[in-house]
Amino acid sequence: MAADYYQLLGVARDADKDEIKRAYRRLARKYHPDVNKEPGAEDKFKEINRAYEVLSEPETRARYDQFGEAGVSGAGAAGFQDFGDMGGFADIFETFFSGFGGMGGQQASARRRGPTRGEDLRLDLKLDFRDAIFGGEKEIRVTHEETCGTCQGSGAKAGTRPQTCTTCGGAGQVRRATRTPFGSFTQVSVCPTCEGSGQMIVDKCDDCGGAGRLRRPKKLKINIPAGVDSGTRLRVANEGDAGLRGGPPGDLYVYLFVSEDTQFRREGINLFSTVTISYLQAILGCSLEVATVDGPTELIIPPGTQPNAVLTVEGKGVPRLGNPVARGNLLVTIKVEIPTKISAEERELLEKVVQIRGDRAGKGGIEGFFKGVFGG
C-alpha cells in the first residue's frame, strides 16, 4: 500500500498550504541528492516531491483526501520541484535545536497544550462486485469517541470546573535544571499530572470519569462513488474521534475491498467474461445473448471466429472513478466447443464437407477438417 502523503511530510490532515510548504522545504533540503548521499535518500526525495505535488494543489488534495492514491494516480509524476526560493540552510539548525531547553540559564518558553484534534479512524468495508461498479448509499456502523454530553467535554462534575494544575502551575510543562561542567541545561517535558492541559480535574464527571469523552457506537450512511475498487479510500469528514479540550473531531477513513464475481473479471475499468459456442456457430457466425453487468445484450459472432478470439462490447465496463459518464468495455473471450461424439447422419454430412474442402481426415475421424477450419 502506498505511503500516506501527510505522514511523509509530517503534517496533520488539516494543515494549511503554508504548513505543507514549510514541511516540504525542510524535508527537501534534508534528502536532496546533492546534500544527502545516503542510500535511499534519492527515493525518499522523490516520494516527498510526489506528496507535495498532490497536497499543494487544492483539487488534487481533495481527490486524495476522498479516494487516496486511486484518486490521483493520473495526476502528474513524481518529478522535481523548483528550489529557487528555498533560501539558506539556517532553518535546518533551528529545527534541530528549537525543541531543547536553553544553555547558561536560557529556557524555552512554556506552552500549554490547547485544543487537540480527535484521532482519525479506519474502517475496512467489503463491497459486492456490482456495488463497487455502480456505487450507491451504504449504511455502516462505527464505534468512536464522542464528547460527553453531561460535562460537555470538560471532564468535570456538574457544578464544578477544572482547576489550575498544582504541579505545573497551569503551564502544562515542567522543567528540570541540570548542572554540568559545560554549563546549566534545562529539560522541558509535558506535565505528568495534567498531561499538558494546565488543568486538573478534582471532581470528575460521573458519566465519563473525567475523560471528557465516551465511546459510543454510531450508524452512518455513506455514498459509494461509481467505479471504486479494492484499495480505494473514502474520507468521511468529522466522523472520527471527538477532539479534546474543544478541538475538532478527526475523520473516518473507509478502505474498500471488493468481492470477486463468478461471471466477470475486472482489470481497471474493463471487464472480462467468457462465452462458449458450438463449432458450427464459430464457422457460420451467429447472434447470441450475453450477460453484462447492465443485463443481457446482443453479441454478433462473425463467421470464422477462431477459438480464444476476444470480442468487445463497448461501454459495458466499469465507470471511471470521478467521471462515471466514461465507462470501460466488456471483453468477451470466445471458447469453441468441439463435440466428442456425433450422430451417424452428422458424420456423413461432415465427411462430405471434408471431400468438398479436400481436407485429409485422420483415421477413424475428421480431425483434419477441424484443423483446417480452426488452424489447429
UniProtKB/Swiss-Prot annotation:
TM regions (residue ranges): none
Residues engaged in binding Zn(2+) 2: C165, C168, C191, C194
GO biological process, alphabetically ordered: chaperone cofactor-dependent protein refolding; DNA replication; protein refolding; response to heat
Subcellular localization: Cytoplasm
Pfam families hit by this protein: DnaJ, DnaJ_C, DnaJ_CXXCXGXG
Keywords noted in UniProt: Chaperone, Cytoplasm, DNA replication, Metal-binding, Repeat, Stress response, Zinc, Zinc-finger
GO cellular component, one term: cytoplasm
CR-type zinc-finger residues: 135-217
Chief localization: cytoplasm
Domain J positions: 4-68
Domain comment as written in the entry: The J domain is necessary and sufficient to stimulate DnaK ATPase activity. Zinc center 1 plays an important role in the autonomous, DnaK-independent chaperone activity of DnaJ. Zinc center 2 is essential for interaction with DnaK and for DnaJ activity.
Function: Participates actively in the response to hyperosmotic and heat shock by preventing the aggregation of stress-denatured proteins and by disaggregating proteins, also in an autonomous, DnaK-independent fashion. Unfolded proteins bind initially to DnaJ; upon interaction with the DnaJ-bound protein, DnaK hydrolyzes its bound ATP, resulting in the formation of a stable complex. GrpE releases ADP from DnaK; ATP binding to DnaK triggers the release of the substrate protein, thus completing the reaction cycle.
Quaternary data: Homodimer.
Name of the molecule in the record: Chaperone protein DnaJ
Taxonomic lineage from the root: Bacteria, Bacillati, Cyanobacteriota, Cyanophyceae, Synechococcales
